Amino acid sequence: MTEIGKTAMETRPSVYILGAGMAGLAAAVRADKLGLRPHLFEATSHAGGRCRSFFEPGLDRTIDNGAHLLLGGNTGLFTYLSEVGAQDSLKPMDPVQFPFLDVASGLRWNLQPSAGRLPWWLLVPGRRVPGGRLSDYLAMARLARLDPNATDSPLTDFLDRSAPMFARFWQPLARAVLNTEAEDASAALIGRMLGETFLKGAEASRPYLAPAGLSQALVDPGVTHLAAIGQPPSFAARIKALIFDGTCVSGIETDSGTVAIADGAVISALPPGEAQRLIPGLEAPDQFNAIVNVHYRLEQADNAHRFLGLIGSAAHWVFTKGDVVS
């Protein structure tokens, strides 16, 4: 960064962002694009939170800290990638399809949304869930009209749990999107996801994978961008406390000292428990579901980078990349 650029950055209004997971990283990048000066604090030694890659000596391979399947309708993600110059870091899957296997029966099928907003694929048995009725799919439109701020009803309030669609589509969808069983999943949040993906057609539903790993595809470009503008994240900077002046934050106390805030905004991109610890009176979720990822190394590499949804299995998804199955 040139001295002129450094001076210009220092004159910008500041915004202080707590947590350098993907939310915090994206907030810092967007703040820069809006003409603000982002100050990003992270307690650990890396950005990205749980969205990252690491070298596993037992496999002698770099693996992702959890399997992530990204869809074309995630406009926030692709805007972020464009802002950091990493538009080509993800691999689009072609054709647009979601392969499934019912482990108990051996039945296989591909969910294949059609191009455009007219969902003619629902009329083609070979492109939809076996045993599904057209009326089952009407629930998608009903859910997409729900307001997340007006209803907290579970997904099952809108579904026929005895229909084949429940086990073969709705339950896997709830687990994949919200990491929650359909009985507890927010109907409105699932509806919003459907409205931004499947109900918009094939391009918005297109799966994307990260061939080089999550860190290289999503995290490193953001960190590099912030470093290039002279505002790299502050790592190993755990927030010990927030200092309040009434309802405004006037200081951020870290392990290395206190950062005074004369003006500017503070954004919390922290996990719920940490945010609750720092912000008096904040109500936050206190129930969570763990995700277990198991990685295997194959004797022979599979050159395809692909995935498979499993029904009636202890494992829900299988991803292959090179000679590693996750």
Where are these regions (language model features)?
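Mid-domain catalytic core of redox enzymes
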Residues: 34, 237-326
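N-terminal Rossmann-like FAD-binding beta1-loop-alpha1 element of flavoenzymes
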Residues: 13-40
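Mobile amphipathic helical/loop "lid" adjacent to a hydrophobic cofactor/ligand pocket
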Residues: 74-78, 82-191, 204
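A short, basic/flexible loop-to-alpha-helix module at the beginning of a structural domain
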Residues: 1-11
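Glycine-rich FAD pyrophosphate-binding loop
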Residues: 32-57
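Glycine-rich active-site loop/strand segments that organize a redox cofactor
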Residues: 49-73, 140-144
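Helical element adjacent to the flavin cofactor pocket in flavoenzyme catalytic cores
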Residues: 193-255
